[in-house]
Amino acid sequence: LQSKENLTASFEKFGIKAVMIGNTTKNVDLNIGKLRLSIPSMRKIWMATSSKLESYQTKKPLATIRAENIIKQPLKFNFPKKFNGKKPIPKQNNIKAAVVREKGSNSEREMAYMMDLSGFIVRDVHMTDLIEGRENLEDIDLLVAVGGFSNSDVLGSAKGWAGAFKYNPKAKSAIENFFQRPDTLSLGVCNGCQLFIELGLITPNHKKQPKMLHNDSGKFECIFTAVTIKTSNAIILNGLEGSTLGIWAAHGEGKFSFPQKEIKYQIPAKYLYSEYPSNPNGSDYNAAMLASEDGRHLVMMPHLERTIFPWNWGHYPDNRSDEVSPWVMVFENAYNWLANKS
């Protein structure tokens, strides 16, 4: 067991004999008596079999690059200055948000919880609700399209989902009217990102639209990585500029492919390292997110809703005692902007 407390004394109180066999240091060596072992070298040996197996699954030379970068891409975090680590204060409100999903979507419950935490009245909207006209989004202020594998990705990621909007008049009218309103916000995460990109909702004035392509590795990637948030016009990222935060990414077609130069796009966040596996998909310009020109609409491949609490993270700074992670600021920003508008 590893603990900051004196566990030996605690065990002895209950008559259990315990012996301390070592202590941690800041060095990257393992010392056992006169034996000195380099932890990075031992880790490389330990991972050799996995790396060999991965070479048969992953497009070359990314399996080798992963093995080389495993010690070159340490997680580094820089938290927002305005973040206090406290849960948002409950609000009395009438600001309505919707989580839109399709057959095969997931993480809608985590997303709804995160939105509710910031004060939104959250409604669950399935595509059948939009197609049949039970929902039209007219009273919705914030629309969030969630992740998953809509229609099992049979036609490609979000292709079928986008088709459900394009070729069903009521659903098409609902989404178009929502995005034409000047007082709304939206977020597309993972499959939702692929959806909004496929529909051309983030860069509507571009003749050539961005595309979401298969990961460079040629396989599904799931990794706890980190993104650095840049200064941008993205409304819901206000106050997060300059921060580097941990986040889960899990997708098979997460590569942003941009037909124009970077200056033509609003890219508010990039992966901490541009190389694989920190950038799990090989996105152009190392992009992790993309925002509309006016900053009201944002898409991202990583899953912020899977990093709500410190214990959701693959690693969280041990010198902090936060109740929630900085990602809750996203929906706090959304709520505040909409509240001021109303």
Regions flagged by a language model, labelled:
Residues 10-36, 123-129, 210-219, 270-272:
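Beta-strand->loop->alpha-helix junctions that form or flank phosphate-binding loops
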Residues 136-144:
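Short acidic/histidine-rich motifs immediately flanking catalytic phosphotransfer sites
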Residues 149-234:
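Cysteine-nucleophile active-site neighborhood
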